[in-house]
Amino acid sequence: MFGHAEIHDGVEVLDVGTGCGYGAALLARRLGDDRVTSVDVDPYLTKAAAERLDLIGLHPRIVTADATGPLTGEYDRIVATVSVRPIPPSWLQVLRPGGRLVTTIADTTIIVVADKTPDGGAAGRVMWDRAGFMRTRHGDDYPPDKLADRFREIHDREGDEVTRGRYPVVEVAEAWELQSMLEVVAPGIEHWYDEDDEGRRTALMVHPDGSWARATAMRDEAPIVHQGGPRRLWDLLDRIRHRRLVEGSLPLYGSRVRITPDGVVHLRRGRWTAVIGP
């Protein structure tokens, strides 16, 4: 992430997601304490990181705050090792003209690199590189898994529609390009996957709107697919897989990025477009 930011002497950096303090340590050693601010919502993490940094003689500014809320100061670089959706407007507000923002989009592996534009937004591209980080938090605890019970409910349920899928069952969470594209075009889907000792694969998909899908088959067979709710989630997935086969790749990586001052991300590559908003 720091490499994509093109950090050099003299820049001031906001490190979003202090964590253990490793990133802040690298930055402070390279740039000096007075040019590094690191922010994290978790007071335990910021306290522990500050103590670790003190032991090695480094004292960057460590702030305990919600990084998606109001921020102070001005920075030439903002590098986030947490993921967001959309981009917090406060990041754009504290980014100096021409400054660079590097972050990942929540629940994807896409890295957005964008430079501040005169209108208060930013422009750049989705890198060919990949990374994934936990989503930003807004309180003291990690959010509960609200859809866990749904997986149990649909494991043996008969679908409103039962069909045979076009392609073998895939573990979407491990197919990074596929999962990221699906999250951009149909955000909020959760996945579960299992393969038994005989090679039978089962994949479950659920969405907060009540849509769900279950696909089961041996490793390289076309699966039986049960689907229910307002949308056909497995059909969405199959359309993305078909596009990748027909065109050789998906248009997400390498796409141009335009971020409006309110943090909404607009993607474009060729005739393909997408919007990443709240």
Predicted regions: what is each one?
Residues F2, E6-R96, R100-V102, A106, ...:
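Conserved nucleotide-cofactor-binding alpha/beta core module
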Residues H4, H8, H59, H138, ...:
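Histidine (H) residue identity feature
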Residues V13-L14, L26, V41-Y44, R152-T163, ...:
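Amphipathic, soluble alpha/beta structural segments
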Residues V82-D197, V275-I276:
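Class I SAM-binding transferase module
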Residues V113, T117-G132, R200-M205, A222-Q227, ...:
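Short, well-ordered strand-loop elements centered on a beta-strand within folded domains, enriched
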Residues E174-R231:
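C-terminal terminal segments
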Residues P208-P278:
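C-terminal target-recognition/interaction regions appended to catalytic cores
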